[in-house]
Amino acid sequence: AYRAQARGGKGAKAQLAKDDDINSLLLVGSTHDYLLFFTDRGRVYREKIYDLPEADRAARGSHIRNLLPLVDDESVQTVLSLRNLDADGYFVFATRNGLIKRTLIRDYVNITIAGLVAINLVDGDELVAVRITDGSADVVLGTRKGQAIRFQEDGARDTGRATQGVIGIRLKGDDTVVSLAVIPEEEKQSAELLSLTESGRGKRTRLSEFPLQGRGGQGVIGHKVTSKTGDMVTLTPVRGDEELLMLTNQGIIIRTSVSQVGSDGRSTQGVKVMRVDDGDRAVA
């Protein structure tokens, strides 16, 4: 639907699914897999894939509120697919205020229709993202002001389901966490982190440039943020052979190759990935 463009293109108006909605996630799974929906309020809901309404490729689909008993303005932040809820491994959680939590997957086996508390949140905090790990991954938290901290996941000891977590990154001023990346053991030598900013700039930086340190520090510069770049919107691991979809607040989207985004050091502003109009900003 979105023709690939060279880096630095203008993008195109996103094709809206319904009510100004756009497609933001595609998961591959078996009909017997579970889908887990984690929300900004720190709750998790569960559905079997075979219980979801079946539709053809061009169908608009059902609104998430027709599937899950979300409350008020509760929104889904992460969707994960799992074959078994008693599987080995961990869920790693990151919150807006810099907390990190690691809990065994099997602690979430008894999710009811009404959902379950996945992480306790204090007033003013919200869940940003959840990832699955095997216990040996490195974790990287990225912030709106371009800071990043890398630490081993076992630096956050595993805790029970209804717990708050511990400090992952110590934030300055009004900074907030915008992304959570986990890098498996086998990818640590070759991994790169892709960072994107509100003005449409981006770069790839080798994971090795992010020093491994203990959790709870202030981290290092992951992307040099200025008035020209705008805030950082994401910091995510890439291999270099993927395609990138970048979306703005006004519904403009560009599709390009990650390999066209230049590789650069941590403390740089990156290259123009997308031309963003005045008054608009990249959001993902």
Model-derived regions, located:
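Short, structured "edge-of-domain" segments at secondary-structure transitions
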Residues: 1-284
